[in-house]
Design a protein with these regions (language model features):
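Short, well-ordered beta-strand elements
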Residues: 33-45, 64-70, 137-138
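Ligand-binding "clamshell"
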Residues: 99-111, 126, 198, 203, ...
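Short, polar/charged alpha-helical segment
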Residues: 45-67, 76, 80
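Bacterial lipoprotein signal-peptidase II cleavage site
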Residues: 7, 20-35
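Short helix-initiation/N-cap motifs at beta->coil->alpha
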Residues: 68-79, 167-194
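Sec-dependent bacterial lipoprotein signal peptides
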Residues: 1-22
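A bilobed periplasmic-binding-protein/Venus flytrap-type ligand-binding module shared by bacterial periplasmic
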Residues: 118-129, 231-244
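A conserved helix-loop-strand patch within extracytoplasmic ligand-binding domains
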Residues: 111-160, 260
């Protein structure tokens, strides 16, 4: 079962990366110098792609100097935002952010919701979820929120039943019915698509699915629905930086008609605008 130690260990392991960012200037440079560029930490796909669209097509006319730094993990963007190495980040959902703050004592806050990446169940071995054999192994993300989302997805697909009211805090201990006797392999979220040759199926976050050339709208055996989904990806800053004029400009651009059209055209339903 996932616990605080896993994220805490990851924070320590990510320290070298964060220090590398800090070495480029004082801890307050990125967050407090509103005359310089706004440095945003982001996952490569689709977050950095969306930010680079803004940078290349919209930022100059809005008077925004935007710099994008890519990260492939779900820890360093928050630690870098907390220590001021970057001015903002764009990679996570509100439930993940709340859980991260609680477990790590950070002070990151949401600015605006931008898009939803539907979580999906994928397999190289079966074409339909009900074809999974008894005792099948399912890879799921090991961070608290995405693990809960993964189990909720499997429940929505009719593969298991969870205790009432557990929401995204669900763990395998909350399973009340498991007719296929599924077993679970908990992995860092980025590793789940790479596990597809070794497990019967894997629950993969939308951004990592796209990076792995999976098409969520087409390839997923079970896919999260957008309606009523609390897991939109958001632009976040350290508490106190919400009124930075650069952040306000970026928030407006990220929720513009131009960005909505870019998301619709580029991702064809695999990423959905939240505005």
């Amino acid at each position: 079962v996932r616990n605080t130690a896993k994220i805490t260990t990851a924070v320590l392991a990510a320290g070298a990366l964060t220090l590398g960012l800090s070495a480029c200037g004082s801890d307050q440079d990125a967050a407090s110098d509103t005359s310089g560029p706004l440095v945003v930490a982001a996952s490569p796909v689709p977050h950095a792609e969306i930010l680079n669209f803004v940078k290349d097509n919209l930022a100059e006319d809005a008077g925004l100097d935007l710099e994008v730094k890519e990260f492939t993990d779900y820890v360093t963007p928050n630690t870098a935002t907390e220590d001021g190495s970057v001015g903002a980040n764009y990679f996570q959902t509100q439930p993940y952010l709340d859980d991260f703050n609680k477990k790590n004592g950070t002070h990151i806050v949401s600015v605006v919701d931008v898009h939803l990446e539907p979580l999906g169940l994928y397999s190289h071995k079966v074409k339909k979820a009900d074809e999974l054999k008894s005792g099948a192994t399912i890879a799921i993300p090991n961070d608290t929120v995405n693990e809960g989302r993964a189990l909720q997805l499997l429940a929505a697909g009719g593969l298991l039943t969870l205790k009432d009211g557990v929401g995204t805090s669900a763990t395998p201990a909350d399973i009340t019915e498991n007719p296929k006797k599924l077993t679970f392999k908990e992995l860092e979220a980025a590793q789940t698509p790479r596990s597809l040759d070794d497990v019967d199926a894997a629950v993969v976050n939308g951004n990592y699915a796209i990076e792995a050339d999976l098409k969520p709208a087409k390839d997923a055996l079970v896919l999260e629905e957008a309606k009523g989904n609390p897991n939109s990806n958001l632009l976040a800053v350290k508490e106190g930086q919400e009124n930075d004029p650069r952040v306000k400009k970026l928030a407006k651009l990220l929720t513009s008609p131009e960005v909505k059209k870019f998301i619709e055209d580029k991702y064809a339903g695999s990423v959905l605008a939240s505005f």
